[in-house]
C-alpha cells in the first residue's frame, strides 16, 4: 500500500508533456487558454443568446432602482427588504423607494456579538479544539445570514427609509470592521475564561465588551434613527402624503407585510435529508431570545410549484442558491450549458447533487428575489392535452398536480439581484430552469398565498382543475392540497442538524 503512495515523478510528467505536445489540438487550446480567461474560451455562444430578458410572466411592475450591497455580504437583508419594498411601492403608487439595509445590519452585528458572548460563557470549560467551539470561533460576526434572521431583526427593530440611514463606508465595505469586532470578541473571551469561577464577573465582562462593540458600530454606521418624517409622492396624481414622527415600528405597521406568514422551504437531493420534514440548524440563531433556524423540506415538484404560486400571485420570492457555477457576469446569466469545460479538461458535470452537497462542491451562498419566468405555451398545451387524456377515467389527486408541475415547461427565470446596475442587465439576471434545479435550494413563501393559489392554480383552467377529487365539506380542495403539499410537514418534529452541516452555511454572496 505504501509503495502506491509515491511522490510526484518528474519523469512521468515529462513523458506526458511530450505526448501532449505532439497533439495539434492541444497546441490550439493551450495558446487560447494562456492568453485568455477559461470562461471566455469555453463559452458556448450559441446557447447564451437564448437567455434574453423576455418573459411570459413578469411581476416586476415598479420602476424601483436596483440596490447595491457593494463590498459586503448583506445579500440576505437586501433580498428580504426588496421583497417588502415591491409591495410598498405598489401600495403607495410611488416611483422609487429603498429601505435602509445598514439599519438592520447595525443591529445584526450587535445581536451576533451578544449571542457569541453568551455562547462563550456557556462553553467556558470547553477545550478550544472542540469541533463546535472551533466552528463558533471561526465565524462570530461575519456579514452572512438567513431569511429568518432578517425576519427577526425587522420584527424586533422595525425598518427605516434609506434616506434616514444611508450606507456608511464601513457598512458597504465590511472587511476591516468585521476583523476589529472579531478581535474585541476574542479579547472578551480571554477575560471570560480568566474569570470563569464567577458567573457575575463573566457577565460583567460580556456587558463591557458588548457596549464597546456598540460604540464601534455607532462610530462606523452612524446613529440609528428613533423618529423621522416621510413624504411619499403619488407618481400619477403628484399628490404628496406626509407622515410625521414615525418610529421604525410605526413605519413597519404602515407597510402591512405579514412576516409571520412567511416560511423557508428547501429542496435538497442530499441522501441524508428526508423530504417533507422540518429541520433545525444548531447554533443558527441571531438573537438570544429566538431559537435556532428551522426550515422544511419538500420534493422537487412541490418546490417548483411553490415558486410558481408566489409569482402567479404577484409576490416577489426570496430564494437562496449557489452562484459559483456556470455564471456569465457580462450577460447576467446562470445556465448549465453556458460553458463547454468538458472539451478542454474532460471534467464531467454529472447530476449527482447528493454527492455534490456531501463533498461541499455546492452550498447556498447568495440570496436574491425571483421576479418572473418564461415558459413555452405551445409545449404546455401539448403536455396538458396528453396528460389529461391519459388520466381521463379517474379522479385526480395532489400527485397529479405535482406531475403537471413537472411538465410545466419553464425555460428561464427573472432575478432581481443586489449587485448594482452595472452588472447583468441593469441589475437583473437570468437563470435557466436546469440551473434552477441544480443550484437553487431554498425559497421563502407565504402560507396564505399558497392556499390562495391552490383554490385554482393559475396554470390550469377551472375546467381541468375540477377534475381533481373533492374533499369533505369541512375541508376545501385548496386546504387539503396545501396540507398534503406543505401543511403536514410543518407538524413534524424538527430534526437537529449540527453546526458543521452543509446547510448551516450563512449567505453572504
Region annotations inferred by a language model:
Residues 4-64:
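N-terminal regions that are enriched for targeting/export leaders
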Residues 5-28, 65-67, 78-81, 88, ...:
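Bimodal feature
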Residues 50-318, 376, 413, 423-425, ...:
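Active-site nucleophile-adjacent alpha helix/oxyanion-hole segment immediately C-terminal to the catalytic cysteine
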Residues 282-286, 352-359, 400-409:
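Intrinsically disordered, low-complexity acidic Ser/Thr-rich regulatory segments
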Residues 292-365, 380:
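Long, positively charged binding patches that form subdomain-scale interaction surfaces
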Residues 371, 376, 382-388, 392-509:
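Conserved catalytic-core surface of thiol
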Amino acid at each position: 500500500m505504501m509503495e502506491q503512495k509515491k511522490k510526484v515523478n518528474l519523469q512521468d510528467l515529462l513523458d506526458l508533456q511530450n505526448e501532449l505536445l505532439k497533439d495539434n489540438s492541444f497546441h490550439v487550446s493551450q495558446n487560447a487558454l494562456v492568453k485568455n480567461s477559461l470562461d471566455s474560451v469555453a463559452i458556448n455562444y450559441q446557447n447564451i443568446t437564448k437567455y434574453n430578458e423576455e418573459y411570459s410572466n413578469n411581476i416586476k411592475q415598479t420602476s424601483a432602482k436596483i440596490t447595491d450591497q457593494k463590498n459586503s455580504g448583506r445579500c440576505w437583508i437586501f433580498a428580504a427588504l426588496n421583497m417588502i419594498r415591491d409591495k410598498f411601492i405598489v401600495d403607495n403608487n410611488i416611483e422609487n423607494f429603498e429601505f435602509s439595509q445598514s439599519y438592520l445590519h447595525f443591529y445584526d452585528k450587535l445581536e451576533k456579538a451578544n449571542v457569541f458572548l453568551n455562547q462563550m460563557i456557556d462553553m467556558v470549560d470547553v477545550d478550544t479544539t472542540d469541533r463546535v467551539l472551533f466552528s463558533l470561533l471561526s465565524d462570530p460576526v461575519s456579514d452572512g445570514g438567513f431569511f429568518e434572521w432578517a425576519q427577526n431583526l425587522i420584527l424586533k427593530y422595525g425598518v427605516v427609509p434609506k434616506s434616514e440611514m444611508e450606507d456608511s463606508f464601513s457598512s458597504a465595505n465590511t472587511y476591516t470592521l468585521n476583523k476589529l469586532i472579531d478581535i474585541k470578541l476574542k479579547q472578551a473571551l480571554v477575560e471570560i475564561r480568566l474569570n470563569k469561577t464567577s458567573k457575575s464577573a463573566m457577565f460583567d465582562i460580556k456587558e463591557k465588551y458588548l457596549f464597546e462593540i456598540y460604540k464601534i458600530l455607532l462610530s462606523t454606521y452612524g446613529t440609528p434613527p428613533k423618529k423621522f418624517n416621510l413624504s411619499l409622492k403619488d407618481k400619477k396624481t403628484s399628490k404628496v402624503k406626509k407622515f410625521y414622527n414615525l418610529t421604525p415600528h410605526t413605519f413597519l405597521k404602515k407597510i402591512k407585510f405579514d412576516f409571520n406568514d412567511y416560511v423557508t422551504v428547501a429542496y435538497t437531493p442530499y441522501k441524508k435529508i428526508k423530504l417533507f420534514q422540518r429541520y433545525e440548524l444548531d447554533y443558527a440563531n441571531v438573537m438570544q431570545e429566538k431559537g435556532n433556524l428551522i426550515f422544511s423540506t419538500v420534493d422537487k415538484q412541490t418546490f417548483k410549484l411553490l415558486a410558481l404560486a408566489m409569482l402567479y400571485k404577484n409576490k416577489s420570492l426570496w430564494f437562496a442558491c449557489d452562484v459559483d457555477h456556470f455564471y456569465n457576469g457580462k450577460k447576467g446569466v446562470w445556465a448549465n450549458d453556458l460553458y463547454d469545460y468538458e472539451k478542454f479538461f474532460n471534467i464531467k458535470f454529472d447530476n449527482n447533487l447528493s454527492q455534490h452537497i456531501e463533498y461541499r462542491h455546492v452550498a447556498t451562498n447568495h440570496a436574491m428575489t425571483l421576479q418572473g419566468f418564461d415558459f413555452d405555451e405551445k409545449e404546455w398545451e401539448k403536455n396538458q392535452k396528453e396528460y389529461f387524456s391519459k388520466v381521463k377515467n379517474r379522479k385526480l389527486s395532489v400527485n397529479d398536480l405535482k406531475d403537471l408541475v413537472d411538465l410545466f415547461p419553464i425555460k428561464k427565470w427573472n432575478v432581481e439581484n443586489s449587485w448594482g446596475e452595472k452588472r447583468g442587465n441593469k441589475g437583473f439576471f437570468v437563470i435557466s430552469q436546469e440551473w434552477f434545479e441544480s443550484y437553487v435550494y431554498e425559497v421563502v413563501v407565504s402560507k396564505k398565498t399558497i392556499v390562495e393559489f391552490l383554490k385554482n392554480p393559475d396554470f390550469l383552467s377551472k375546467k381541468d382543475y375540477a377534475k381533481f377529487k373533492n374533499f369533505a365539506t369541512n375541508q376545501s380542495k385548496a386546504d387539503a392540497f396545501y396540507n398534503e403539499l406543505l401543511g403536514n410537514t410543518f407538524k413534524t418534529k424538527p430534526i437537529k442538524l449540527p453546526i458543521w452541516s452543509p446547510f448551516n452555511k450563512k449567505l453572504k454572496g
